UniProtKB/Swiss-Prot annotation:
Disruption phenotype: RNAi-mediated knockdown in a glp-1 (ar202) constitutively active mutant background restores fertility. It comes from Caenorhabditis elegans. Glycans are attached at N74, N185, N346, N475, N632, N677. This is Disintegrin and metalloproteinase domain-containing protein 10 homolog. The lineage of its organism: Eukaryota, Metazoa, Ecdysozoa, Nematoda, Chromadorea. The active site is at E427. Residues 797-837, 864-922 are annotated as: Disordered. Residues 805-834 have a biased composition (Low complexity). GO terms for molecular function: metal ion binding; metalloendopeptidase activity; metallopeptidase activity. One of its GO terms (cellular component) is cytoplasmic vesicle membrane. Binds 1 zinc ion per subunit. InterPro entries: ADAM10_ADAM17, ADAM10_Cys-rich, ADAM_Metalloproteinase, Disintegrin_dom, Disintegrin_dom_sf, MetalloPept_cat_dom_sf, Peptidase_M12B.
Length: 922
């Protein structure tokens, strides 16, 4: 055998060997390269055991850090962990399993920390049986994932040499499953997200069919104001609320998979593993959204408010049992219908509601979500309430369009954690208003990779995989600008439909965020998100948020040698990064109505508490009194009375301060304590006038309105001309007045009704002549333009039409024709030609050319008593639209809306050919 042939055979054998053993060293189609971990976990387990024993003791509030080390990727990882502070879970977080309350304590098994030799690193995950599972991000930005081996092996096939694996994010292989996806020969390559063009059209139709309701009425009646309605705004008028509450659900498919894998067939362990799964996903999503500047909107944050876990015990043959509310029992559903199952529930109490599953959807789809829009008339996305939508043949149905779904399986393989986390961030991006990245400049590809909102799932190892493109930032910023301009509402209280308008359900953040220029617990300083923010603030002593992963002291840390930062308080010298001394008498707080001036004490960067003034001093234009240095005391309480609201009277009367005296709410104008000759509680511009008038912006009419700058009580919905017109026509007093007047003057109502009917009849009669008709016996419609410009022509044309109609009546039997009628046929000009000839014409002689055989003459019976034996002849002419006309005009063609290609019979075909011959001969 020659050498070239031998080399070719060796090459073929090598290729076959590589293809056959392609996945021998890989866990699945996603992970090819990994390293095993088998560190001793006894010391970790002891820490967890000691914690469980002391959960009821006071010492359980604080837990000593736990640590372990292992070697992988030619380095040593020395991990330091401590229990989470629950900042990722809402203060009212609740868990349920199959609808029943479940006592799950996330702080008992969830941990976060850092690498001991890398202070800028971050570690988060869970610890079960002394084994850690989670993610590590080094100070240089490299990411590692640690998974239990039980996730990839059956219970009887689990390895005994190691308990965990570790792999880098850049070792996630996407080439194989993309080949499989392309091999499906789909008409549309979904590539991870199910938001195809067909699905987009269907979802858009639903989003635009929402039922509108009265926003202002529901807003006030349902107590829509948030716990702190006086939340600050920025220079663009956007409220400083950045926390989005989440409702996380796991269906029975995901529960069953985790129970058979890392759950070890233990129900309690399984539900804790699912909560850990939720935690790791939202933790990764927060890192992405908190680190993104959406055109000035920074610090978006997500908290888990409720978790629901559904088990197979709640389903029976694809349906929920009678005592279960599991919405996901249906077995064989596609991705869009699975999203509909989640959307059928009422999720108005949450910013977003997501369902995680282990269903292998067609086309490799990993997720789907409703896309938000900045348009008020388009529903869907963040904060959308549960309301009715018109779905065509299905009629009106209730939907919650603040929903999305994510699956953890793709073509039979469990998706790596980093991929599913980016998928969740991608679908939430849809909820925030971003479609898929487009055009080409937002799809850069290699070497930096595509962005989060790319239609295909990404591995997460490229620099752009965890970032939003400029296109996505623009789209999300537009939606947030509309939502955050609305007053924040408490979604747990205001859960009723408030129309298609954008509801602001974001809440104030309870945990610290590095980059919001607010000094919070756990931070050394906070000068801003970027270095430009710090420069604008005049702080050169603090490290900004964007310095994460660049080495140095780390974000929100003081620079080396700095004693303090101006972000900590006014008592820090921005030039020297040191405290102002007490002898400098640096003023840090000016005197106010209820507190005295305060200077720095040289011990802290924050300004000391100002000495309060005496209680009872009038403040806020004498509508409040000082209490412990704050202007929040009650004026009525100074006289032993209680505060109340006036609810009856004119608008300018409702803005007076009122107190309850002798069991009645009385205006301060009529109280002797606030007479015109009083010596205290004097108001500006109201000297020698009785009563106290409320400050502009104060609530009035029992919180149904507010006092404007003219000190008049303005209703919340009385902000525009339409609202004023509605109040004028449909308020209770107007309706009662009109009803009483109609009862007293019933005869006027009757006469007016008759006059109205007569006017309408005349209107219809006059306008009927301008309405076209398909009846060939009726005259053509008149020109409305001539009637409007020359009203006199309407009467003349009306008379002419009657005369023409009288002259076209065929004579009765035996009637004599008019002189000359038989000698010559009448001629009419085209303009005066009627729309159709009479069906029966007088008997006239019809000249037939010699040699031409005319059409057969239809006969009719003669009139009884008629002496004429000649039968009458019916002269038939084709009715419109077949009336002879100029072929070049529109009248020569068929009527609009009718078929042109009418099927012909054999006789019709013969007639057509004959007619065609005649035309040709003309």
């Amino acid at each position: 055998m020659s050498s070239p042939i031998r080399n070719r055979l060796q090459l073929v054998v090598t290729l076959i060997f590589c293809l056959f053993f392609e996945n021998v060293n890989g866990l699945n189609n996603f992970i090819d390269n990994f390293e095993t971990l088998n560190y001793r976990a006894t010391h970790v387990a002891n820490q967890v055991t000691r914690r469980k024993r002391s959960i009821d003791s006071a010492a359980s509030h604080y837990q000593e850090p736990i640590g372990f080390r292992f070697n992988a990727y030619n380095r040593t990882f020395h991990v330091q962990l401590h229990p989470i502070d629950d900042s990722l879970f809402h203060e009212d977080h609740m868990s349920d399993v199959d609808g029943g309350y479940a006592d799950i304590k996330p702080s008992h098994f969830l941990y976060e920390g850092y690498l001991k030799d890398d202070p800028n690193s971050h570690v988060h995950g869970s610890v079960f049986d002394g084994v850690f599972e989670g993610h590590i991000q080094t100070g240089e930005g490299r990411r590692y994932s640690i998974d239990k081996a039980a996730k990839y092996f059956e219970r009887d096939d689990r390895p005994t040499q190691y308990h965990s694996i570790i792999y880098r994010d850049d070792e996630i292989n996407h080439r194989k499953w993309r080949v499989k996806r392309d091999a499906e020969n789909l008409s549309e390559q979904m590539q991870g997200c199910g938001f195809s063009s067909r699905v987009r059209r269907e979802m858009t139709d639903v989003q635009n069919s929402g039922e509108s309701t009265d926003f202002f009425t529901n807003y006030m009646t349902m107590g829509g104001r948030s716990k702190r309605a006086n939340t600050l705004r920025d220079h663009d008028g956007l409220y400083f609320v950045r926390t989005c509450s989440l409702y996380m659900q796991a269906d029975h498919k995901l529960y069953e998979h985790i129970r058979m894998k890392e759950g070890n067939n233990d129900p309690i362990r399984t539900r804790e593993e699912i909560v850990s799964l939720f935690y790791n996903h939202i933790k990764a999503v927060n890192e992405i959204y908190e680190g993104t500047n959406f055109n000035g909107i920074k610090g978006l944050h997500f908290v888990i408010q409720r978790t629901s876990i559904y088990t197979p015990d709640s389903c029976d043959r694809g349906r929920a049992k009678t005592d279960s509310d599991n919405p996901f029992c249906e077995e064989n559903v596609d991705v869009s219908n699975f999203l509909n199952l989640n959307s059928q529930r009422n999720h108005s109490a949450f910013c977003l509601a997501y369902a995680l599953t282990f269903r292998d959807f067609v086309g490799g789809t990993l997720g789907l979500a409703w896309v938000a829009s900045p348009q008020f008339n388009t529903a869907g996305g963040i904060c959308q309430v549960h309301q009715r939508y018109n779905e065509g043949s299905r009629g009106w149905v209730y939907r919650s369009l603040n929903t999305g779904i994510v699956t953890l399986v793709n073509y039979g393989n469990r998706v790596p954690a980093r991929v599913s986390q980016l998928t969740l961030a991608h679908e939430i991006g849809h909820n925030f208003g971003s479609p898929h990245d487009f055009p080409a400049e937002c799809q850069p590809g290699l070497p930096d990779g595509n962005f989060i909102m790319f239609a295909s799932a990404t591995s997460g190892d490229k620099p752009n995989n965890g970032k939003f493109s400029p296109c996505s930032v623009k789209n999300i910023s537009a939606v947030l600008a509309v939502v955050l301009k609305s007053m924040p509402v408490d979604p747990t209280r205001n859960a009723s439909p408030v129309g298609i308008g954008k509801r602001n359900c974001f809440q104030e953040r309870t945990s610290a965020f590095c980059g919001n220029q607010i000094y919070e617990p756990g931070e050394e300083c906070d000068c801003g998100f970027s270095q430009a923010d710090c420069d604008q603030m005049g702080d050169k002593c603090c490290v900004p948020h964007e310095a994460r992963g660049n080495g140095g002291p780390g974000p929100c840390k003081r620079k080396p040698g700095a004693q303090c930062s101006p972000s900590q308080g006014y008592c820090c010298n921005p030039d020297t990064c040191s405290l102002h001394g007490k002898n400098e008498e640096k003023i840090c707080r000016q005197e106010s109505e209820c507190s005295n001036l305060q200077t720095c004490d040289g011990r802290n960067a924050q300004c000391p508490v100002s000495p309060p003034k005496h209680d009872g001093i009038p403040c806020q234009d004498s509508t409040k009194v000082c209490s412990s240095g704050q202007c929040n005391g009650s004026v009525c309480a100074m006289f032993g009375l209680e505060d109340c609201f006036l609810t009856e009277g004119k608008a300018d009367e409702l803005c007076f301060l009122a107190c309850i005296k002798d069991g009645k709410c009385t205006s301060s104008v009529h109280l002797p304590e606030f007479s015109a000759n009083r010596t205290n509680f004097l108001q500006n511009m109201r000297k020698d006038k009785p009563g106290l008038i409320l400050h502009p912006g104060s609530p009035c009419n029992n919180y149904k309105g507010y006092c404007d700058i003219f000190r008049k009580c303005r209703s919340v919905d009385a902000n525009g001309p339409l609202a004023r017109l509605k109040n004028l026509l449909f308020n209770k007093r107007t309706i009662e007045t009109l009803t009483q007047w109609a009862q007293d003057n019933w005869w006027v109502v009757g006469v007016g009704g008759l006059v109205f009917l007569v006017i309408m009849a005349l209107f219809v009669k006059c306008c009927a002549v301008h309405t076209p008709s398909t009846n060939p016996n009726k005259p053509p419609a008149l020109n409305i333009y001539q009637t409007l410009t020359r009203p006199g022509t309407l009467i003349r044309q009306h008379r002419q039409r009657h005369r023409a109609a009288a002259g076209s009546v065929p004579p009765g039997p035996g009637a004599q024709p008019r002189s000359g009628a038989a000698s010559a046929p009448s001629r009419t000009t085209p303009s005066a030609r009627p729309s159709a000839p009479p069906l029966v014409a007088p008997q006239v002689a019809v000249a037939v050319p010699p040699g031409v055989v005319g059409p057969p003459i239809p006969l009719i019976a003669t009139h009884p008593g008629s002496s004429s034996s000649t039968p009458a002849v019916i002269v038939l002419e084709p009715p419109p639209p077949y009336t002879a006309a100029d072929p070049g005009s529109a009248m020569g063609g068929p009527r609009r809306g009718h078929r042109k290609n009418k099927r012909q019979t054999s006789s019709d075909a013969a007639g057509s050919s004959g007619n065609g011959g005649k035309k040709k001969g003309k």
